[in-house]
């Protein structure tokens, strides 16, 4: 269905209109993006070429870093370009495309983090059956399911807003394409649509986060049965994953699991989960994973 609209493009206000401040932010976000790409690509390459990293956890970690690469690349390059050239205009179709990619890979990451928690549960609570349960085809299937889940979530989000009429104004007080600021510009009642957006994004994030907390509660309880060496190894892998989960889900829940309104703090929170978290994930996993660190040194 063709969208009923008069607006053909939107203007993203970004962080500031001051040219000097824009240049400072340009350097900062360019550095963040370079670090994100280098760190995540290093993990993908290490897992791919290393003979010692053949575990399901390493496979899922490579999948997570690949998602972070695409997710970050859907937002940061345009942000960096806008800060450098000062051209904050984006076409309606490009806005929708970025929105689709954000939700596709953001949703996929939610499901993949659940899969990784299940992998840790099997490894720690059912160690004798781990390789039987987490066979290669099972790992591939779980990864595909994560992507399909993100795809369906993204299709649903886009389908409920694409046909909205946008008659003007076309100025969005944000630095990237986000759902709630867009709903404010629709020249129709968006109350029901806002509830659907919250249910699809916020509710799914909240449920996933609660499931993760429960799973890690079970895992931590099971650590008592392990030897001291086993507890240390399990604690190392679990603590890194829990850190990533908290960094990703807490800001996401704040942004999505609330009424469809915008707040002054939204930009700062959005920077954390769209820019900072993808950059920190490789650092968190490598610092807490001795096997990954050793494999990187052999490259």
Swiss-Prot record:
Residues linked to a glycan: 6, 87
Top-rank lineage group of the source organism: Eukaryota
Extracellular side: 1-23, 78-98, 157-193, 257-267
GO MF term set: G protein-coupled receptor activity; olfactory receptor activity
InterPro entries assigned to the protein according to its UniProt record, in alphabetical order: GPCR_Rhodpsn (IPR000276), GPCR_Rhodpsn_7TM (IPR017452), Olfact_rcpt (IPR000725), Olfactory_Receptors (IPR050427)
Cellular localization per UniProt: Cell membrane
Biological function: Odorant receptor.
Topology in membrane: Multi-pass membrane protein
Residue stretches spanning the membrane: 24-47, 56-77, 99-118, 138-156, 194-217, 234-256, 268-287
Gene3D superfamilies linked: Rhodopsin 7-helix transmembrane proteins
Similarity comment: family membership: Belongs to the G-protein coupled receptor 1 family.
Record keywords: Cell membrane, G-protein coupled receptor, Glycoprotein, Membrane, Olfaction, Receptor, Sensory transduction, Transducer, Transmembrane, Transmembrane helix
Protein name, per record: Putative olfactory receptor 4A4
Cytoplasmic side: 48-55, 119-137, 218-233, 288-299
An example Gene Ontology CC term for this record: plasma membrane
